[in-house]
UniProtKB/Swiss-Prot annotation:
Gene name of the record: grcA
Known role: Acts as a radical domain for damaged PFL and possibly other radical proteins.
GO MF, any single term: formate C-acetyltransferase activity
InterPro entries linked to this entry: Auton_GlycylRad_Cofactor, Form_AcTrfase_GR_CS, Gly_radical, Glycyl_radical_cofactor_GrcA
The protein, known as: Autonomous glycyl radical cofactor
Disulphide connectivity of cysteines: none
UniProt key word Phosphoprotein: no
Gene Ontology terms: cellular component: cytosol
Lineage: Bacteria, Pseudomonadati, Pseudomonadota, Gammaproteobacteria, Enterobacterales
Species, as recorded: Shigella flexneri
Residues with the Glycine radical modification: 102
Stretches assigned to the Glycine radical domain: 5-127
N6-acetyllysine modifications at: 48, 88, 92
Keywords: Acetylation, Organic radical
Amino acid sequence: MITGIQITKAANADLLNSFWLLDSEKGEARCIVAKAGYAEDEVVAVSKLGDIEYREVPVEVKPEVRVEGGQHLNVNVLRRETLEDAVKHPEKYPQLTIRVSGYAVRFNSLTPEQQRDVIARTFTESL
């Protein structure tokens, strides 16, 4: 169990009025803030704190969502035939806008190679 404390009495003056998180299961203390001698987030054995007195302080734990890497999806809702026709007849599709790597671009502003690449990557037979 994690308990938040403020040290009110200690032989080591650096500990006085410092805040810690005590992990009773591991026998460890994590420094939240101290005047000197201890770094923020430094973890020490509770026994290293020596003979101390403290008062408990409320600890609020907020769930943290960690995203590493992530996913990215571009959705273009149209038919393959529309893009192929836009390659052949760009004048018919001056406003045709698609998503490429998160950006909206006019299909006609892409090079022919980029247009072919978009068509090849956008339409697949199966996943």
